């Protein structure tokens, strides 16, 4: 969680990074952004709403990068990946020429969010519990964001079929 700290550390400690950011020559993103960037040979700089919601820079109500937060942390919006719903087409890959015909990259979700969809929690009130390296409880709260009860936070559950599904998570 929280891409901001890593980005600030890079800009402050890597020689030339701050200038590259100011010039529009430095990009940032989440793990899906990097994977898609590599798979598309640098053609696509994108992320989905669920991964973006983990950056501390994404507004879950507008589905956009939060300009106030970007300004607060002095992050140029040009560094940020394009935002897409989970069921969008994110690009194409031949996996470095391994395949003759391109394979479409269609569908991206963050891990807990993917588990919510994978457990078919498509209706309000359905949830999942995941235990692994970390643990996560996530419950679909429907298409309207709500203030989470104490100890939980409101997040994007997933975005598909033109709809945004919110979730409580803890």
Predicted regions and their residues:
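Hydrophobic transmembrane-helix microenvironments that flank and shape a buried ionizable site
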Residues: 4, 108-110, 166
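ATP-dependent carbohydrate kinase catalytic cores
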Residues: 50-161
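Glycine/Thr-rich phosphate-binding loops that ligate phosphate moieties of nucleotide
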Residues: 12-19, 25, 29, 33, ...
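Single conserved hydrophobic/aromatic residue that forms the stacking wall/gate
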Residues: 1-5, 9
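A residue-level structural signature of the nucleotidyltransferase/glycosyltransferase Rossmann-like core
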Residues: 1, 26-28, 128
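Enzymes and membrane/adaptor proteins characterized by extended Gly/Ser/Thr/Asp/Glu-rich
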Residues: 41-51
